[in-house]
Every structure is written in structure tokens, then in C-alpha cells.
Amino acid sequence: MSDYGDVTVDSLNNVKCEFGQGFHFLLDAHLDEIGMIVKSITDDGFIKVDKCGGIDCRMLLASEVSVWGKEEIKGIISNLPPHLQKKGDSKKVPSFDEISIDVGMTKEEAQKVISLGDRVTFKRNFTQLAGTQISSSVLDDRSGVASIILALDELKKINAKFTILFSSQEELGLRGAKAASFGVNPDEAISVDVSFGYTPMCKKSDCGEIGKGPMIGISPILDSKMSNDIKLTAEKYNIPYQIEVMGGGHTGTNADVLTVNEKGIKTALISIPEKYMHSPVEVVDTADVENTASLIVAYVKERVGEINA
């Protein structure tokens, strides 16, 4: 991002880029991902772990992972063959106490390259599906990061100030955005994340649809005028969109902490619909990513034009 402005990385590994002058927009998406942390190495050489972020234990067994020790160590989360399972085992969801990673090493070999506290991530399994849909781990929220990057060339042309924040530790309690937005004092903020994409396993009323455009958040904690103006902008520029209504006092995204940072920030939320969230096989439609970028640019242009009118 150094082609666009001054780039800094803080002590929490938040990446920030600032450029331009005028009405000040903060655009946020988080860089971090769910994963695990090494707790111990058994006498048999298996790696015991605990979770970092909201991991669904149902999808862990037989997953391919990388342990980030002194070097990248490939591993498999061990599972019990069906032939050896007892009655009821097939319906049981394992706890993290029962989870272990097989790296094919003895304890002595593992201890030379793996330390307690090393991080564990899921294997990057990028797959092109039909049309413009893709599958991979970490699309939550690298797809949001990608949408902001796609918007940068056009944003650079607009007479406004921008702080681009690619935040850390969203999956651990929104910690990165809370720290990194302190002292920025933007006029408005837009957080870009993912939200639930429909599959036959969930209710349509709870989800957006893949390929039908970005989801504009409506919530008591989000700025209602911003949300409505983003919707009107999408209609004006013929950008497909969906409405996501979130009750209660939270959205589960960085928008929650941006709204109450310092004196408060007017904040909107745009989400990319995603299937199989928090799994190694998350799915998004690249058309939704591109339309999210287009919507950000269009809204900023409209807002700056309104201010300068």
C-alpha cells in the first residue's frame, strides 16, 4: 500500500495507510484468522492445542494444518477410524482436550522445531468453483481486505482523507481495531467484513445469498443515515445489494468498537456473503467482492460531493 500513502504497523500488527486531505474516512477490514495455539507435546509426539477464535470443533477431525514453529510443520488433526468407534461416537463432537495434531514426529523430534505457544493455522486450500465462486480458508476477512484494496485506485482520485486499517485480533475480541482507531478521529468509518451466506442448512431469513451483492448492515449501533445513504447509492449506481438487519447491541464485527471509539464515530457495516464461515473451506463470490469495492467508491464520491456542494 506504500504506493498510496504512508504505511505503519503498530505493536498489535495492525496495518494502517493514510493519504489525502479533506473529509476523513476510515475504512476497516481485519487481517487475522481463526486458528489454534500449541499447549503441549505428548510422549507420543502428538501436539495438543487450544483454540484462538471461534472454531467449530465439528469440522476439525482429519483437517490439514500448519504448525508455525521454527519452520512450517505440516500436520493432520487425528481422528478415530469408524471401525474402532463405539456406539454413539459418530455423533459426538470432540472437545479441544480430545484434539491432537499428528506431525509424524517423536516427542524429541517435535521439541526441536515446535515450542509451546506456537500458532497453528488451517491449510490454504484455494479452489475455483463454478462461475465466480471461490473456496479457501481465511476468506473471513481477506475478502474484505481485497475489496478495500480494489477500491484504492479510485479512492486516490477523490478529494478526501482516508485511513485504511487492516486490523489484527478481530477474532479475539475486536482488539486490533479498538487500539488502532484510537487517535484517528475520522468523520465516518466503514467496516467491511463477511456475513452468513445461505445454504440448505440455515434459514434464508438469517442469511444473505452468494452472488447477490454486498450486505448493508442495519443495526441500532450503526449510523442509520449512513446505512440508508449507502443503500440509496447502490440503487443509484445499479450495484446489487442486500439488507442485513442485526438486532441487539452488537454486530459481531469491528463496527462494534469503532462506533464507541473516543468520542464516537459514525460507522456503517458492509458485509460480503460467505458460506461455511470459520472453516477451512469458506466460499465467497468474487463478484460480491468487486461490487463491495464499487459500493465503497460510489458512496465516498456521493458523500464528498454532498459536502462540497
What does each of the following model-derived ranges do?
Residues M1-A309:
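N-terminal hydrophobic/helix-forming segments and targeting peptides
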